[in-house]
């Protein structure tokens, strides 16, 4: 299937190595270097130039003064690259494997047919998630830019996508780090001989508190609550002090201190760039796998564990006839791999030019999917144990979804195991490291985008810019730190990010495969890797992946999620508020399209053609070519 781009094709690269550039003294698209990386004459956005040394004063071959000056300005340095290839892989894995892999996949799996759910999940991964993942890695590595300035080289009219991504990242940072703060509060509370969520004798407990595992004879009623549930709801969240979304109450000083510590860790992990964050992920990306292995072995030895495993994997093939199962599979793989957040573009932009991003995409996607699958065993062996201890069905124990599955059900199970303090400490440390990895990545996507777009302002002041970003995210988190903050977290999670990111990636896929052209894109990949993507990838990028995304978007719009948290049902106006928050980021795309068409000179046809045609090196402002110094 041969496709023709809607914009004009770029001239093929003729400057393939340092010697070629030196011979011709030209500014051309850079290709692989002999060392496999970026030579000193290469500029981070994919253009290279080395001043001629063998042409003398021949006026016919002299380089224009403006170009010579430009080269002199940028020749002093290079774009930062990863210290080691494994730093990049661990960073991508740490970003893709997050808290959702632990709490969302197991729940979605058993809700949608158990083992039968793996079939639509794998299909959606092969035809939708992995192609998009591969596309973003290749784009970032070839053009060597963040999510804003990269559009000058693809299709300038869609530059608003980059600004949309930055706003979405701010919304995510506003609630995601609050969940990490909850885990940190649990971790601090775990340093006791007896975990505080095992008893009903604390100041936050109510008369309805009933301990399943008490040696006393107890009667469980419809109004009974477990100590773990009351610890989470009344002590950590203090949600009983809020009347709902319309009155979230005051700010919890305990959670505020926790999130301040979280943001401090984040700042000193990313303030110097990927060379430092690449070292931090050696701990934050590997530690969760050590803990998951320990918990898997421990869970498998618990009484009743097999009940949980059967409940998790027992296939219900009739479920595959339901549209909702396929929607959940598509949404799960998409949000698990995480294209559309600007992170993959940013991380790949620090790779060497001929790094095998195709192999990276397959390896990291496989690791992500396997982690989700194995996490199900970690969760459900413990849920089977809980069901055995309570003499209940696993479905009754597994009714909690989202964070409650971790902070109530799993926390309660850990508290009633031998060596409970040890397991609680490593479990909540694992949650914190999983969350930190994703936050490092999300903020790096924004930082790279802004520094690449405005290097003349921020290139020499990265530390101050990162500090400004972290402080902004902290103040943005204040509403989620209130007594009703959990209501805000749920609203932002469901409406502010999901639909907006889906829209971004849908437009991105169309812009790259239809406007930039899948033929040109495959040519770029061949220039980097030495081989061109096959027909499977081309068909996925042009047709299958956009349909995959459109399918999820339409499903969401037709059946928006009904918001409910604990016993609280969200008011009707909260749906409108959610859509407004989501639209506030996506509006950047049509706004920039309008701005571009209005400010571009010429007739309407000339404006459109110029706006969808990649800019040449001489058209890109000097500020966009100057080095992102870190």
UniProtKB/Swiss-Prot annotation:
Keywords: Antiport, Cell junction, Cell membrane, Cell projection, Disulfide bond, Endosome, Glycoprotein, Membrane, Metal-binding, Neurotransmitter transport, Phosphoprotein, Sodium, Synapse, Transmembrane, Transmembrane helix, Transport
Modified-residue entries (Phosphotyrosine), positions: 47, 142
Glycosylation sites: 208, 217
Intervals, Cytoplasmic compartment: 1-87, 136-160, 272-277, 348-360, 444-463, 517-538, 596-630
PTM (free text): Phosphorylation at Thr-276 increases 5-HT uptake and is required for cGMP-mediated SERT regulation.
Main localization category: membrane
Binding site for Na(+) 2: 96, 98, 101, 336, 368
Subcellular location: Cell membrane; Endomembrane system; Endosome membrane; Synapse
Region feature Interaction with RAB4A, mapped onto this chain: 616-624
UniProt modified residues of type Phosphothreonine: 276
One cellular component (GO) term of this entry: synapse
One Pfam family hit: 5HT_transport_N
Membrane topology reported for the UniProt record: Multi-pass membrane protein
Tissue specificity: Expressed in the intestinal crypt epithelial cells (at protein level).
Binding site residues for Na(+) 1: 94, 97, 434, 437-438
Top-level taxon: Eukaryota
Residue intervals annotated with topology Extracellular: 113-115, 187-252, 298-324, 381-421, 484-494, 559-574
Transmembrane segments: 88-112, 116-135, 161-186, 253-271, 278-297, 325-347, 361-380, 422-443, 464-483, 495-516, 539-558, 575-595
Catalysed reactions, semicolon-separated: serotonin(out) + K(+)(in) + Na(+)(out) + H(+)(in) = serotonin(in) + K(+)(out) + Na(+)(in) + H(+)(out)
InterPro entries found in the cross-reference section: Na/ntran_symport, Na/ntran_symport_serotonin_N, SNS_sf
Subunit structure: Monomer or homooligomer. Interacts (via C-terminus) with SCAMP2; the interaction is direct and retains transporter molecules intracellularly. Interacts with filamentous actin and STX1A. Interacts (via the N-terminus) with STX1A (via the H3 domain); this interaction regulates SLC4A6 channel conductance. Interacts with SEC23A, SEC24C and PATJ. Interacts with NOS1; the interaction may diminish the cell surface localization of SERT in the brain and, correspondingly, reduce serotonin reuptake. Interacts with TGFB1I1. Interacts with ITGAV:ITGB3.
Function recorded in the entry: Serotonin transporter that cotransports serotonin with one Na(+) ion in exchange for one K(+) ion and possibly one proton in an overall electroneutral transport cycle. Transports serotonin across the plasma membrane from the extracellular compartment to the cytosol thus limiting serotonin intercellular signaling. Essential for serotonin homeostasis in the central nervous system.
Family that this chain belongs to: Belongs to the sodium:neurotransmitter symporter (SNF) (TC 2.A.22) family. SLC6A4 subfamily.
Note: This protein is the target of psychomotor stimulants such as amphetamines or cocaine.
Protein name as catalogued: Sodium-dependent serotonin transporter
Organism from which the protein derives: Cavia porcellus (Guinea pig)
